[in-house]
């Protein structure tokens, strides 16, 4: 592809940017770099968009340091980074929960006379929330934005509402929603975020009230809205009510996308009604919907639930023959499915092959592997993967602490828990109780007293 473009005399900076963007999306960063060099040789100079595209690719698929190195090359080429440059770097660092790096990038922006925009602050707030630093996130909303002369818009509130809901602070989210209503009309996405949060908290009545508010605002519930409510019914084992809602909406003329069918199928799988699940999948095909990666993921989940590994292998072969690209969820299903069916070595081999194929190892897959290996009794193997993880969240640490306790490694669990407190990572009190009671049960009374005192001291220091 690159060689062909070198011979193309009509190459312009705009075309160069389009090609670089395509290569980056397909993770072909080396080819993108070669294309830029070839463009320069042909007299086509890259601009800030070219480098920003490259930086975004490195942030997503390689690493922050590699992405940051591109900014030095930009300046060497006489091109000044802009706010979009730093937003990509900030997003990449925030995705990896590298708060110190995010704050450093903010400082550097200001030093270069580049002012953060709403997107920059939205990303910072999201990072604070993921790390459990809620006060800092609200300080950004009520103080930093005001000092920067920026007015929070719907996107800012959506970020905050989504973070509050995911952290379980539903009442705070509802209060913030009222504040938002006093400033401007919430978007359909806002209602969907709140309905999703309420459904995950299993607050059925409030979710129904929010749906009524959505309709009063002049919006029509979309597939996302109803799929969210369907999932609530299915999670609370109200399978019959969920199926009734699904059929009612179909009769009323609502067009369901594949996701609604997959929600129905997933619920039927979880309740052991695999025959009905197959029938719904066949109905989806009869309606003219070809299998895409989402439907294949649902089928993979179905086959793993049945323990039908032969069908899994056949389906993976079909995906490959059709030239379809498995997504992160596909690989998570495979790793989780293999672990649940006792195929721990195959799960590890697949996990390792993901890295070899250049597939980003997302946090969910890593957590899944570590937790699954621990539960299968392979704690030492799990800990090796845990130590190699670049990004860890509250679930990672909580899972490992509990699994270490189950394996009677209370001292190790205590040290890990203390490191979490020192880093300001919020861990459920159940993990603290498990560690302290385990130390006492194993006769380590001195260790228990020492650990309790250190935990208390650290918690007071972080408050």
Swiss-Prot record:
It comes from the Eukaryota. PPR repeats lie at residues 12-46, 47-81, 82-116, 117-152, 153-186, 187-221, 222-256, 257-291, 292-326, 327-361, 362-392, 393-427. Coiled coil: none annotated. Keywords: Repeat. The keyword Repeat applies. GO terms for molecular function: mRNA binding. PROSITE patterns: PPR. Transmembrane segments: none annotated. Pfam families: PPR, PPR_2. SUPFAM superfamilies: TPR-like. Belongs to the PPR family. P subfamily. This is Putative pentatricopeptide repeat-containing protein At4g17915. It comes from Arabidopsis thaliana. The lineage of its organism: Eukaryota, Viridiplantae, Streptophyta, Embryophyta, Tracheophyta.
């Amino acid at each position: 592809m690159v060689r062909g473009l070198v011979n193309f005399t009509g190459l312009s900076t705009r075309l160069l940017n389009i090609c670089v963007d395509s290569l980056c999306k397909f993770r072909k960063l080396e080819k993108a770099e070669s294309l830029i060099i070839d463009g320069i040789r042909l007299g086509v100079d890259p601009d800030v968009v070219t480098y920003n595209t490259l930086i975004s690719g490195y942030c997503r698929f390689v690493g922050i340091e590699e992405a940051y190195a591109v900014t030095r090359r930009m300046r060497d080429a006489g091109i000044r980074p802009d706010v979009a440059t730093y937003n990509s770097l900030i997003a990449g660092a925030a995705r990896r929960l590298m708060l110190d790096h995010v704050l450093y990038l903010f400082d550097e922006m200001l030093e270069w006379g580049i002012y953060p925009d709403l997107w920059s602050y939205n990303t910072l707030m999201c990072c604070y929330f993921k790390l459990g630093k809620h006060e800092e996130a609200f300080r950004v909303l009520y103080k930093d934005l005001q000092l920067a002369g920026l007015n929070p818009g719907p996107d800012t509130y959506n970020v905050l509402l989504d973070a509050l809901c995911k952290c379980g602070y539903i009442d705070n989210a509802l209060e913030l929603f009222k504040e938002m209503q006093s400033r401007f009309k919430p978007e359909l996405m806002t209602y969907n975020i709140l309905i999703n949060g309420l459904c995950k908290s299993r607050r059925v009545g409030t979710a129904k009230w929010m749906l009524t508010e959505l309709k009063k605002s002049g919006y029509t519930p979309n597939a996302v809205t109803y799929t969210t409510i369907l999932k609530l019914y299915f999670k609370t084992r109200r399978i019959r009510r969920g199926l009734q809602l699904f059929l009612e909406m179909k009769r009323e003329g609502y067009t369901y996308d594949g996701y609604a069918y997959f929600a129905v199928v997933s619920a039927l799988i979880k309740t052991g009604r695999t025959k009905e699940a197959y029938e719904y999948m066949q109905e989806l095909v009869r309606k003219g919907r070809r299998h895409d990666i989402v439907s294949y993921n649902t089928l993979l989940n179905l086959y793993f639930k049945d323990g039908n590994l032969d069908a899994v292998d056949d389906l993976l072969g079909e995906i490959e023959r059709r030239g379809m690209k498995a997504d992160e969820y596909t690989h998570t299903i495979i790793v989780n499915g293999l672990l649940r069916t006792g195929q721990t070595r195959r799960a590890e081999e697949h996990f390792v092959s993901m890295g070899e194929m250049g597939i980003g190892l997302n946090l969910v897959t890593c957590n899944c592997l570590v937790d699954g290996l621990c539960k299968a009794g392979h704690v030492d193997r799990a800990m090796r993967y845990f130590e190699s993880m670049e990004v860890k969240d509250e679930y990672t640490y909580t899972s490992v602490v509990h699994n270490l306790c189950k394996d009677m490694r209370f001292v190790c669990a205590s040290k890990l828990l203390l490191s979490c407190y020192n880093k300001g990572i919020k861990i459920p009190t159940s993990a603290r109780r498990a560690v302290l009671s385990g130390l006492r049960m194993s006769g380590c009374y001195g260790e228990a007293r020492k650990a309790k005192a250190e935990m208390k001291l650290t918690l007071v220091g972080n408050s």
